[in-house]
Amino acid sequence: MLNMLSETSHIQQTARSFAESLRNFVDKLIDFPKPLVALVQGGAVGLGCAMLPLVDAVYCSERSYFSTPYIKLGQTPEACSSFTFPQVLGMTMANNLLLNGVALTSCQAKQHGLVTSIFPHDQFKQHAMSCVRRTAMQSSEAMQKSKELLRKSSQTQLKHVNYCECNILMERWASEQTLTNFRSFVS
């Protein structure tokens, strides 16, 4: 009995620690003053997909795909995706990704506004880096001030959503169902 209580306590502490780390990471993305660019040359799964609306540009290869298999794992949305996905993708597509675990192709992701540009897979690096260099050559001061204006009105709301999502994730990660689903998913 003591072993079970000790194990349960350890699982809860681990879930709390993971949730706090995730919350801090996502808060840093929300507050980051300089342009953030994501390059996706394969699968953007889970957090890798969920955080994309928090960056300023997403360049992907034609072979990329985007997936959030949360429900399959017994997990809930993260990285503010419960808020940003309906805004960016529309409610129907957000539901498909977050509730049904449907993956998006690169073309679907671009069509729905999750991706900025798609490049041929074999030329991805050169095209993506050309875009990154073009961004880097702009006035950094003007870029930061513009980003501040674009993000200011949603920062507080995003941080609140992040806080709520992480609290629920902490519960889910400590639940027996989610632990069983994780074990099954990994094996």
Predicted regions and their residues:
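C-terminal alpha-helix plus adjacent terminal tail
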Residues: L2-M4, Q13, G101-C107, D122-Q126, ...
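Generic structural signal for alpha-helix termini and adjacent loop/cap motifs
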Residues: T8, F32, S175-E176
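Crotonase-fold acyl-CoA enzyme core
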Residues: D27-E141
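Glycine- (often His-adjacent) and acidic-residue-rich active-site loop
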Residues: M1-N24, A44, Q157
